[in-house]
């Protein structure tokens, strides 16, 4: 008899295969072992560190090849942990001073670090604890000579089942064999969910008990649209879901027919669908999915995975490649957004209690022109190879925009004096991520050429709710009327001055949000490339005038639930 488990739908698709249960390895050891050769234990620890570096570098490179540099960046953080003398030295000292074995020294010191970070009322520090936990587990396995689960060894059709999938696990998934996965924990914005959408495999997360219900090799169905997981399905269920799977793939083929189509509503209003990218490697997905431009090029990934700042020439070549490939379509490049959750090993950033509200993005760039100016020069030089727009992230005041623009104009003059060509048709804009910026949108609109609303941060700053914290996740509300009112305010301010507004957060490609954003007058929707064709089909079936009426009603609602009900009534 089959069993139905409910979870959170994380990635579209239907997977039907045998369960591959990720079993946690036995990493137990004897902490009371008498150690006679202390230096051999230190050497064992050092060897385990080096072996872990080699392993993680391979995993990182595999992740970059399959998923792009932005998804591989998590492993740069893990490699930083393995190179951190503030962690490595205390472990070596522990082994020598307390005369304990390598496993004990590692475990006791990392446990202390993890405990300290987790006790901080700061989600960024808690994420560092997760990095240390993941890395220390790998090092401990090497010390003990134990193999960690390796999904890359799967050589037949399978559905991965586990408590959660670590970044290392997801980076090793082979799309040829892995049809989908199911986890006990996680939500739609968890790392494993985001990775599953990049891999385009079915996923259900947050089932709470899947590992207790499934045995190795059980036949399992994963419905990534509904969040249903069926263990040991009946013959009728297998047939029904095989049909649903076929329909899903047929639908994907149908969507491909829209690749070169216009995005235009039934009443003749055009919308622009653009893609978010992290590196030039992402361009093939942009082209394959019919993007009409790039609405967000995250340049920070040029700076990651290396031990020194990229040169002006390296940056120029990357920007040039993107602009040339897009062949005259608009490319919106975000200047360096480092700090917060993104660190660089060669940049000594101050440790802050809340780095998301601290020294990051445009604040850092204006304070360190030796970092900012080479990027501006590279962008200006590349501008003659396509349609370049530049936007500054995390702008809170009009002075920050003016200072950044002034620096850019200075570098333009310098380049012209040096004999370089620079386009005269570059638009300058800002990310709207801070409520203060949205509140002063009418002031900014007089000076910027465009706005791009970064909803991921705007939502958490407006509702004072960390989107990575499970305890307050109920407050992370994209459809809260307060968010919709801010979005409306920004769009109206830009249109009043003859400017345009885009959106590059997760919300831009959300099927519930699209009708509302269309109704509010959003000009550009920038999203993951894999979401573009679905959004095009949705918009092409909507009336702009009707969506404007819907949006006007939505901003008068009191709660997110009321807004969602309004949109759901539209679908009926």
Swiss-Prot record:
Transmembrane segments: none annotated. Keywords: Cytoplasm, Kinase, Magnesium, Metal-binding, Phosphotransferase system, Sugar transport, Transferase, Transport. GO terms for biological process: phosphoenolpyruvate-dependent sugar phosphotransferase system. Its cofactor is Mg(2+). InterPro entries: PEP-util_enz_mobile_dom, PEP-utilizing_PTS_enzyme, PEP_util_AS, PEP_util_C, PEP_util_CS, Phosphohistidine_dom_sf, PTS_EI, PTS_EI-like. It catalyses: L-histidyl-[protein] + phosphoenolpyruvate = N(pros)-phospho-L-histidyl-[protein] + pyruvate. GO terms for molecular function: kinase activity; metal ion binding; phosphoenolpyruvate-protein phosphotransferase activity. Gene3D superfamilies: Phosphoenolpyruvate-binding domains, Phosphohistidine domain, PtsI, HPr-binding domain. The active site is at residues 191, 504. Its EC number is 2.7.3.9. The keyword Lipoprotein does not apply. It comes from the Bacteria. It is found in: Cytoplasm. Its main location: cytoplasm. Homodimer. NCBIfam families: PTS_I_fam. Belongs to the PEP-utilizing enzyme family. The N-terminal domain contains the HPr binding site, the central domain the pyrophosphate/phosphate carrier histidine, and the C-terminal domain the pyruvate binding site. General (non sugar-specific) component of the phosphoenolpyruvate-dependent sugar phosphotransferase system (sugar PTS). This major carbohydrate active-transport system catalyzes the phosphorylation of incoming sugar substrates concomitantly with their translocation across the cell membrane. Enzyme I transfers the phosphoryl group from phosphoenolpyruvate (PEP) to the phosphoryl carrier protein (HPr). The reaction takes place in three steps, mediated by a phosphocarrier histidine residue located on the surface of the central domain. The two first partial reactions are catalyzed at an active site located on the N-terminal domain, and the third partial reaction is catalyzed at an active site located on the C-terminal domain. For catalytic turnover, the central domain swivels from the concave surface of the N-terminal domain to that of the C-terminal domain. This is Phosphoenolpyruvate-protein phosphotransferase. The gene is ptsI.
